Structures are given as structure tokens and as C-alpha cells.
Amino acid sequence: QPATAEQPATAEQPAAAASAADGEVRIALRGLRGVVADKMSRSRREIPEATCWVDADATELLAARRAMNAAGGPDAPKISLLAVLARICTAALARFPELNARVDTEAREIVRLERLHLGFAAQTDRGLVVPVVRDAHTRGAESLSEELARLTGSARAGTLTPGELTGSTFTLNNYGVFGVDGSTPIINHPEAAMLGVGRIVPKPWVHEGELAVRHVTQLSLTFDHRVCDGGVAGGFLRYVADCVEQPAVLLRGI
């Protein structure tokens, strides 16, 4: 009967109305959000990741940055904390090159990379992006600071080129700017690792045998367990922590 033929259409209408009444909002995963979703999903599927953490006393690092900026004079560009952390990253990767790598799954090969292109997470009105500092291993703290500032400005203005958003080999994630202590970030595929830095806050800390208030941060390293074992990952993170606690450690590489 004609009435029977119309019943399926009639039955669907209340369901659609119910969804609208529940306040359900559907947002298409397209554009930047879609690209991020696809990349993070692929990373979770393909990379057997592990994370290690360490707390570090950053008091001397903050003092070293102040001294570096004071030494530059009033007209010199200021070196950002992110740039100092990036410089520590490049030094650590020079000591532990296993983490500047990717895995060729089809060939079943680990590909170690001579050049370091450092990605860093930047939050914008359009979402999270990862601009890339090319050949970061060739730059000092001042050069890193200038390039990080330039790329951050372009990210916020929405003027980054595709070449400035691709090709990173290692990522630095300063999630401390969001006021959090720790995280287990998803590796930026096809990289092999990501260094995370939490907020720097005053905490009770045993310093030189006595209890004192020091500026402490939590560092994390999420790494692809296919490219290295825990010894390498732990050694990398410990070296980063040593540089944070005693910036003079970096001078040994000069």
C-alpha cells in the first residue's frame, strides 16, 4: 500500500529531530584538523612508542639565559627560553643520533639522518601546527631564537609555507606554556622521538644537601621503540636534564 511505502521516510524524521534536540554538533574533519587527525592516527597505528620522564632543576638554566641576554647588550635580540631548549636538543641529538631517524616500514630499515630539522609545536587560532627549523644542528642559540620567533609569527599570521611545515626529523614540544607539568605526546610521524618540556615552577628541592626552593620542570621523551632501546632514550633524556641543571655541560661540546 502507498502508506507502507512512505513509512521508512517518516520513521527517519523523528530520529533526525531527536539528534538536533540533543544538541549534537558534527564538525567535519577537514583542512588542518583533518590533516592532524590523519597523521596522529597513523602514528598510533604504526609506532610502538614508549615514554620516560625526569624532573630537573632549571634554576641555573634560567640564570644562564639571563646572563646570555645581559651579555648581548640592550640593543641585541633577546634569546628565548625555547631557543635555549632547542640548542640543548641539538647537542643531545649529536650525542644520541639514533633518535634523529625514521623507520622505512616497507624496506624494514632504520634510516638515520645526518641533518637535523627541528619541529616545534606552536598553538594558533587555527589549531596546533609544527613549524620546522631547517638544519637546526648548524645554529647557535641566537640564530635559533631568531628563526623560532620568525616561524612562530608566521604561524600565528597563517602565512607559513608548506616547506616550513614539513620535513621535521625531531620535535620539541613545550607544553609547559599551557600551565601543565607533563604529557605523553604522540610522536609526529615519521619521526622517531619527541621531547616534551613542562612548566617551570618553584618547588621544594634538595640542593647541595639542603632543602631549598628551586625552579623545577618535568622533561619527557616519547620515542619509537623500534629505533632504540631504553638505554639510549634514557641516556638522551638524562643528558638533556644535565644541561638544564648545569648549562656549563654544553661548553664541553664547544
What are these regions (language model features)?
Residues 2-254:
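C-terminal catalytic/motor cores of large multi-domain enzyme assemblies
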